[in-house]
């Protein structure tokens, strides 16, 4: 509704006189205002605080206020702690300029419940162009907002699933490419065991909601089946980001398999000690894998495929560092893992 324009209803009502028709039209307009399902209010634009002078049934039902608690008050009683000051300022500017405005604003019902309100405010001017009233209609957008948020959440979930799937596929691709294919039966068994290690890690991730994964829990999960009571675990509570878990699970699996077949766990007197600690920066962690009593490999021993996979997971997937040292006591492996997750490239 523009200034200096007096809106009229289109059409006419049959009546014995123009005066009666005018009265009928006013009565019909009042009935329509009251019975429409759209919440509506009218405020007095000539008074200082723009008090509400009319409020229909739909408005009272939406807000939960009785008529006596609405009439005579400014509409700001619907505002609350989380109402946007920007939206409020936009409404005030439109009132000051006597112009139409549509604003989506967070309002509060009498019960304290929040609802999203799409407010359309229109000025009503007299024949002389002066402001008489402001007419406000509302649409409850709460359910729409809820659905919108669900759709956004679903989209984020799909993106996260896509990202996680790419990470897992990258790891599986590494397993397939780096496993020894000389003997088909051994090749199939090695891949199966490595994928099972990933599956156990995935189960742990799912159980923890893909957040706050305990480093100790992962280490014990992957190592205990091979070490039983012959492993010592020592370190503080450290939680890992989810992208680190599956590549690290494969690293631990390979180290445990090697220890069981060729290292300290392959001999009666051998012992395995695994310790961990946070990096000085607080981001990421160190793992020390120590095998005491492990047989020293021949100097010209061929680099095993498990070693290749461990190196690929630590250095390429996790962007970490690995150092292996043989001594008279046995094998010492130091692993450094930064906080960032793996890449899929």
UniProtKB/Swiss-Prot annotation:
Coiled coil: none
Keyword Transferase recorded: yes
Modified residues (S-4a-FMN cysteine): 75
Positions of post-translational Phosphohistidine modification: 163
Region (Disordered): 1-21
Domain PAS positions: 25-98
Disruption phenotype: Mutant produces similar amounts of exopolysaccharides and shows no significant differences in the biofilm biomass between light and dark conditions. Mutant also forms a higher number of white nodules compared with the wild-type, independently of the illumination conditions.
PROSITE patterns: PAC, PAS
Annotated transmembrane regions: none
Gene Ontology terms, MF aspect: ATP binding; photoreceptor activity; protein histidine kinase activity
Enzyme class: transferase
Post-translational modification: FMN binds covalently to cysteine after exposure to blue light.
Spans annotated as HWE histidine kinase domain: 160-236
EC number annotated for this UniProt entry: 2.7.13.3
Residue ranges of every copy of the PAC domain listed in the record: 99-153
One Pfam family named in its UniProt record: HWE_HK
Keyword set includes Metal-binding: no
Composition bias, Basic and acidic residues: 1-11
Catalytic activity: ATP + protein L-histidine = ADP + protein N-phospho-L-histidine
Function summary: Photoreceptor that regulates flagella synthesis, exopolysaccharide production and biofilm formation in response to light. Also required for competitive nodulation.
NCBIfam families linked: PRK13559.1, sensory_box
Name the UniProt record assigns to this protein: Blue-light-activated histidine kinase
Organism: Rhizobium johnstonii (strain DSM 114642 / LMG 32736 / 3841)
């Amino acid at each position: 509704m523009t200034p200096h324009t007096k809106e009229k209803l289109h059409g006419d009502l049959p009546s014995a006189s123009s005066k009666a028709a005018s009265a009928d039209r006013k009565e019909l307009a009042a009935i329509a205002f009251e019975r429409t399902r759209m919440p509506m209010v009218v405020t007095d634009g000539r008074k200082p605080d723009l008090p509400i002078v009319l409020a229909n049934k739909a408005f009272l039902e939406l807000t939960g206020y009785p008529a006596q608690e609405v009439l005579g008050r400014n509409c700001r009683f619907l505002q609350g702690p989380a109402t946007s000051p920007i939206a409020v300022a936009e409404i005030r500017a439109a009132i000051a300029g006597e112009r139409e405005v549509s604003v989506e604003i967070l309002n509060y019902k009498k019960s304290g419940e929040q609802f999203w309100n799409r407010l359309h405010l229109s000025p009503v001017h007299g024949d002389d162009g002066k402001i008489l009233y402001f007419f406000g209609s509302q649409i409850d957008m709460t359910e729409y907002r809820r659905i919108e948020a669900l759709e956004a959440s679903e989209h984020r979930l799909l993106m996260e699933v896509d990202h996680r799937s790419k990470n897992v596929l990258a790891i599986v691709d590494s397993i397939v490419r780096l496993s020894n294919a000389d003997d088909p039966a051994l090749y199939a068994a090695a891949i199966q065991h490595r994928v099972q290690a990933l599956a156990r890690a995935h189960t742990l991730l799912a159980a923890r909601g893909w957040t706050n994964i305990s480093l100790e829990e992962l280490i014990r999960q992957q190592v205990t089946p091979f070490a039983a009571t012959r492993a010592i675990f020592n370190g503080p509570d450290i939680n890992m980001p989810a992208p680190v878990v599956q590549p690290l699970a494969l690293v631990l699996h390979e180290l445990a398999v090697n220890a069981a077949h060729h290292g300290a766990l392959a001999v009666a007197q051998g012992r395995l000690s695994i310790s961990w600690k946070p990096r000085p920066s607080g981001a990421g962690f160190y793992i020390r894998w120590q095998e005491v009593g492990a047989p020293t490999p021949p100097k010209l021993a061929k680099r095993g495929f498990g070693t290749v996979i461990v190196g690929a997971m630590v250095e390429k997937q996790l962007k970490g560092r690995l150092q292996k040292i043989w001594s008279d006591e046995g094998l010492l492996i130091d692993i450094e893992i930064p906080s960032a997750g793996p890449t899929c490239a």
